[in-house]
Amino acid sequence: MLFRSRLAKELEPHHLFFLEDALRPEHKESFRLIRNASTTPLAMGELFHTKYECLPLFTEQLIDFIRCDIGHLGGITEAKKVAILAEPYSIQTAWHGPGDIGPATHCANVHVDVSIPNFGVQEMVFFPEIVQEVFPGAPEYRDGRLWPSEKPGLGCDINEEAAKKYPYQRNYLPVCRRADGSVHDW
């Protein structure tokens, strides 16, 4: 953990928005070491699946941003509960929004963002025009901001006729294996 503490300290002159997932979530004491060694903001949460996993890092103020994946967390209601638990500790949200989640989850992220007082930043993939064609109503980026659709619900829909033009092609995320064949995390 000394390496991570030193890294966080050496990154200070670069004024990172945050250092993301520097540790596995169960290493609470190591978060404390990094926190004591550096002023670089810390973000954690992609591996969390419940609000209960987040709580120890909140109550001890060991992170600055919570980065859960709303789809893995249990949806909008659970994400709002996590945000409510984080807010008294001045912890902001930075929901996980990579390219391997679809437009509906990005819609959910933005809807939570605009409904909470401790929104920080939103990781976002800007989908190509064909995705916008198939999923009208996905969040739009205009004037330096993300805008949710004003349509009911999540605001996005599926255009089934447009989807027929782009048949499904099976794809897989890489499997992370060590040289001995054992599976490890990303």
Where are these regions (language model features)?
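Short glycine/proline-centered loop/turn elements that form peptide/ligand docking sites
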Residues: 6
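Phosphate/pyrophosphate-binding betaalpha-module
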Residues: 23
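Short, small-residue-biased leader/transition segments that mark boundaries at the very start
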Residues: 1-2
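Extended hydrophobic packing segments that form well-structured cores
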Residues: 154-186
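Shared catalytic-loop signature of beta/alpha-barrel
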Residues: 9, 15-18, 26-152
